[in-house]
């Protein structure tokens, strides 16, 4: 059975891991880094992902960042002269992770466990699954990020019973989950969060401050300059990271724009105290979900044994202090906040494949599910923090006499009125026999699978007619669209492989030309003109093919040159070996001729 890789598909950075034996291992990317920027660039028909894409973000307008924040929406991004769905961009990141995982493992990878924020709704989960499919991956399981982190933390502690709070502040999302660990069971008791809070928001506070200060000083608004804005974003991210280790950092952006008098530079010092002041409201927003999760789990702070920090943004000192103040506990630092989620996903892959025994994961649905009923009321069928998979049915009736059909409006959220919650989908149950209002019996059943993806069934108990849908929001992709995108992704992969092969061939040609020219020069006047002429002729032919750019011709001429150059090299080595042998023979003969010289007779006297 092929390996099931674990993928943390992050807003800012992503990571991929695999189970080796019983231990999860992070796979480094081609640049040797253990996390990969979730950045995609398009340049000259080429798709660039990761570190290389991030490096050119300042100068390349066709660069897409933080696509995860758009997952589950109908919003598209424009790049490379066309529009892409969030699923397509995410698929390019997944395809890149899959590619270097395959290189590391030396085998094809077709299956993955992908993590999502615990507070992702159904549309966002479905979009993530679709992205995996487009990338050529069978998504075996969608796992909540805090749950994956708990798996990685608790894998070697299965004999110990404890309750843990996972505080997960990533690049674009924030989750808090409370789990109970014991006897190999990872039971999620409650989860809460904010899908619009993350490291990007902390960066934005610094950007806004820099824009404001520069405008005060120079009267120019940098927020309208796209290239300047990207430089500000890079500087803000760097300053934020610096301030996790030092109390003050210098921001220097020469030639940020031009004024009437010439070029202008941005120079400022940002202290940690100022940064804390700018981001105080963001840190404050992390407190409510912590309290909500504890309340939903029916626990008090004294019941929590460990607090685990996950996500790069938990390195911000003010965030760490807020966690300490809110929980009264020193956070556990035994896990790497950037890597632990991917490692947990790899462990879940091992559970699915049977490589990890005696581990059971019980996750929950983060938001309540229900339908709209008379008066625009949201009637919940499944409460938030219900363990999944689960199923729940409830019987409803018609609101009017002789009503021939009922509209089922499926929603997700916590507000009492339907209009204030997230619409997951709508469908209709028709051909209801004429009857007074309140008489027909319509049974509505909600099913949530292990990935947190919802399907809904409505059944007329009188006629036994039923209608079932797997929820597809207005951002969902049809099977045909996914199929087309999969083909596009495969074509891109083939084009990338072809481009790589072309570069390798051109490098081989350059190397062969250099080596052969060197050999021809070294063999000048050494007496094997036939082989030299043949190599020179093959060399000239290869140079012509190189100029024409015909790859097939280059390949054929390269093979021909290698053959002739090898024959010439053999002659050269044979000559060198013969000369060495002759020299060794001459030295041996000389030693024999001189063997009688300088011999002195001596007497030996025994005492």
Curated annotation (Swiss-Prot):
Residues 579-607 are annotated as: Disordered. GO terms for molecular function: ATP binding; ATP-dependent protein folding chaperone; unfolded protein binding. InterPro entries: ATPase_NBD, Chaperone_DnaK, Heat_shock_70_CS, HSP70_C_sf, HSP70_peptide-bd_sf, Hsp_70_fam. SUPFAM superfamilies: Actin-like ATPase domain, Heat shock protein 70kD (HSP70), C-terminal subdomain, Heat shock protein 70kD (HSP70), peptide-binding domain. Induction: By stress conditions e.g. heat shock. Coiled coil: none annotated. Signal peptide: none annotated. Residues 595-607 have a biased composition (Acidic residues). Residues 579-591 have a biased composition (Low complexity). Keywords: ATP-binding, Chaperone, Nucleotide-binding, Phosphoprotein, Stress response. Pfam families: HSP70 (PF00012). The modification Phosphothreonine is found at residue 173. PANTHER family: HEAT SHOCK PROTEIN 70KDA. NCBIfam families: PRK00290.1 (NF001413), prok_dnaK (TIGR02350). Acts as a chaperone. Belongs to the heat shock protein 70 family. This is Chaperone protein DnaK. It comes from Streptococcus thermophilus (strain ATCC BAA-250 / LMG 18311). The gene is dnaK.
């Amino acid at each position: 059975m092929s390996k099931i890789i674990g993928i943390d598909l992050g807003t800012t950075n992503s990571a991929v891991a695999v189970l080796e034996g019983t231990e999860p291992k992070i796979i480094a990317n081609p640049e040797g880094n253990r996390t990969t920027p979730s950045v995609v660039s398009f340049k000259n028909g080429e798709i660039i992902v990761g570190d290389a894409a991030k490096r050119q973000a300042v100068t390349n307008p066709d660069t897409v960042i933080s696509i995860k924040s758009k997952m589950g929406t109908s919003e598209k991004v424009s790049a490379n002269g066309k529009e892409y769905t969030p699923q397509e961009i995410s698929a390019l990141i997944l395809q890149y992770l899959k590619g270097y995982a395959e290189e590391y493992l030396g085998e094809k990878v077709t299956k993955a466990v992908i993590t999502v924020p615990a507070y992702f709704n159904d549309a966002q989960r479905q979009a993530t699954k679709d992205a995996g499919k487009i990338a050529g991956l069978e998504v075996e399981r969608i796992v909540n990020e805090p749950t994956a982190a708990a798996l990685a933390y608790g894998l070697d502690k299965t004999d110990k019973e404890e309750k843990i709070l996972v505080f997960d502040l990533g690049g674009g999302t924030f989750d808090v989950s409370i789990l109970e660990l014991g006897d190999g069971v990872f039971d999620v008791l409650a989860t809460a969060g904010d899908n619009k809070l993350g490291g990007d928001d902390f960066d934005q506070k610094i950007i806004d401050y820099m824009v404001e200060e520069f405008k005060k000083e120079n009267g120019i608004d940098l927020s309208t300059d796209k290239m300047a804005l990207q430089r500000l974003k890079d500087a803000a991210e760097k300053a934020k990271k610096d301030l996790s280790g030092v109390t003050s950092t210098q921001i220097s952006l020469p030639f940020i724009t031009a004024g009437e008098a010439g070029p202008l530079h941005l120079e400022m010092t940002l202290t940690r105290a100022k940064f804390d002041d700018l981001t105080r409201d963001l840190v404050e927003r992390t407190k409510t979900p912590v309290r909500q999760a504890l309340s939903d789990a029916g626990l008090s702070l004294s019941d929590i044994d460990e607090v685990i920090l996950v996500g790069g943004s938990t390195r911000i000192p003010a965030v760490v202090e807020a966690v300490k103040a809110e929980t009264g506990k020193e956070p556990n630092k035994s896990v790497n906040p950037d890597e632990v989620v991917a490692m947990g996903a790899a462990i879940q892959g091992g559970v699915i494949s049977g490589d990890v025994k005696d581990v059971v994961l019980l996750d929950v649905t983060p938001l309540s599910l229900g339908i709209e009923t008379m008066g625009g009321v949201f009637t919940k069928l499944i409460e938030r923090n219900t363990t999944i998979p689960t199923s729940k049915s409830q019987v409803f009736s018609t609101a009017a006499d002789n009503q021939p059909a009922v509209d089922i409006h499926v929603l997700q959220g916590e507000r009492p009125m339907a209009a204030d919650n997230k619409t997951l989908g709508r469908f209709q149950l028709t051909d209801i026999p004429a009857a007074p209002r309140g008489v027909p019996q319509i049974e509505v059943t909600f099913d949530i699978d292990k990935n947190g993806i919802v399907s809904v069934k409505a059944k007329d108990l009188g006629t036994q007619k039923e209608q079932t849908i797997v929820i597809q929001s207005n951002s969902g992709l049809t099977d045909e669209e996914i199929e087309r995108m999969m083909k596009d992704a495969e074509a891109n992969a083939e084009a990338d492989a072809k481009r790589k092969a072309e570069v390798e061939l051109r490098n081989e040609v350059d190397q062969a030309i250099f080596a052969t020219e060197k050999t021809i020069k070294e063999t000048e006047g050494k007496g094997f003109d036939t082989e030299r002429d043949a190599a020179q002729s093959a060399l000239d032919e290869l140079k012509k093919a190189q100029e024409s750019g015909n790859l097939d011709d280059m390949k054929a001429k390269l093979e021909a040159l290698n053959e002739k150059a090898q024959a010439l090299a053999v002659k050269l080595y044979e000559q060198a070996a013969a000369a060495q042998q002759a020299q060794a023979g001459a030295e041996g003969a000389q030693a024999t001729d001189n063997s009688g010289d300088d011999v002195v007779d001596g007497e030996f006297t025994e005492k």
